[in-house]
Each structure stands twice: as structure tokens, then as C-alpha cells.
Amino acid sequence: MEKNSFKLSNPLEMRMAESTRIRAKYPERVPVIVEKAGQSDVPDIDKKKYLVPADLTIGQFVYVVRKRIKLGAEKAIFVFVKNTLPPTAALMSAIYEEHKDEDGFLYMTYSGENTFGGSFYC
């Protein structure tokens, strides 16, 4: 985990309170933290916290990440949840329910390489 990561920068109690407040106010949305993998050569993302519609697919969210980092179409990007590549067609709500952290946020990491050796799902 990076030194400037959201988890290291904010105590657990604060993160839990924030995610609880967000989920109560926006029940149809998923609180997501997106951070670049440590050694990746892709650009840094301009913001880490996202409030994503629950019915958005992983593939649609990857598109959002690509736009935020201004990555050209010729470059690949991989988004990981707990070091695995989630299925592109999976809904963010399903991935959130299965992989949310104890603090109530879903943590995702992006990279220009398939750094964790995960398999692809189409």
C-alpha cells in the first residue's frame, strides 16, 4: 500500500463514519477509493474518492478511470479489487457487497499492466 494511501492517511473510525454517512445519504451509490498501483507507469488519478451508481458495471467504471487519468485508447488499463480482476460485466453493487472493506469503502487499484497476474473475464 502506498504511503499516501487513503487508508494510511485517515483513521479507521473516520473512514467508517464517512462511508456510513455516504451510504445513508446515497443508498443507490457505492463509495469507492481508487488508487494507482505502486510501480505502474500510468498517470496518477486526479481524485481518489468516487460515489458510483450501484448499477454501473466494472467495464463502465474502468472507462471513468481512463477518462480521469487521460489515458489514450492505445494503452491498456487494469482495475483490481483485492489483487484480482473483477468480471467486466459485474455490477459495482455486487463487487461492493462481496469485497467492501471493514471501513465501508470499496478499494480498487489500477495499473497499466496486469501486475497481479489475474485472469480475464469477458
UniProtKB/Swiss-Prot annotation:
Gene3D superfamilies named among the record's database cross-references: Phosphatidylinositol 3-kinase Catalytic Subunit, Chain A, domain 1
Q: Where does the record place the site Cleavage?
A: G117, G118
Origin: domain of life: Eukaryota
Which Gene Ontology terms describe the biological processes this protein takes part in?
Answer: autophagy; protein transport
- Where would you say this protein principally sits, based on its record? membrane
Q: How does it sit in the membrane?
A: Lipid-anchor
Pfam families named among the record's database cross-references: ATG8
- Tissues where this protein is expressed: Constitutively expressed.
- Locations listed in the record: Cytoplasmic vesicle, Autophagosome membrane; Vacuole membrane; Cytoplasm, Cytoskeleton
Record's comment on post-translational modification: The C-terminal 5 residues are removed by ATG4 to expose Gly-117 at the C-terminus. This Gly-117 forms then a thioester bond with the 'Cys-558' of ATG7 (E1-like activating enzyme) before being transferred to the 'Cys-258' of ATG3 (the specific E2 conjugating enzyme), in order to be finally amidated with phosphatidylethanolamine. This lipid modification anchors ATG8 to autophagosomes.
Provide GO CC annotations from the record: autophagosome; autophagosome membrane; cytoplasmic vesicle; microtubule
What keywords were assigned to this record?
Answer: Autophagy, Cytoplasm, Cytoplasmic vesicle, Cytoskeleton, Lipoprotein, Membrane, Microtubule, Protein transport, Transport, Ubl conjugation pathway, Vacuole
Query: What positions belong to the pro-peptide in this record?
Result: 118-122
Lipid addition (Phosphatidylethanolamine amidated glycine) is recorded at G117
Which InterPro entries is this protein grouped with?
Atg8-like (IPR004241), Ubiquitin-like_domsf (IPR029071)
Q: How does it assemble?
A: Interacts with ATG4. Interacts with NBR1.
Biological function: Ubiquitin-like modifier involved in autophagosomes formation. May mediate the delivery of the autophagosomes to the vacuole via the microtubule cytoskeleton.
Q: Name the family the entry cites.
A: Belongs to the ATG8 family.
Q: What's the name of the protein? A: Autophagy-related protein 8b
To which species is this protein native? Answer: Arabidopsis thaliana
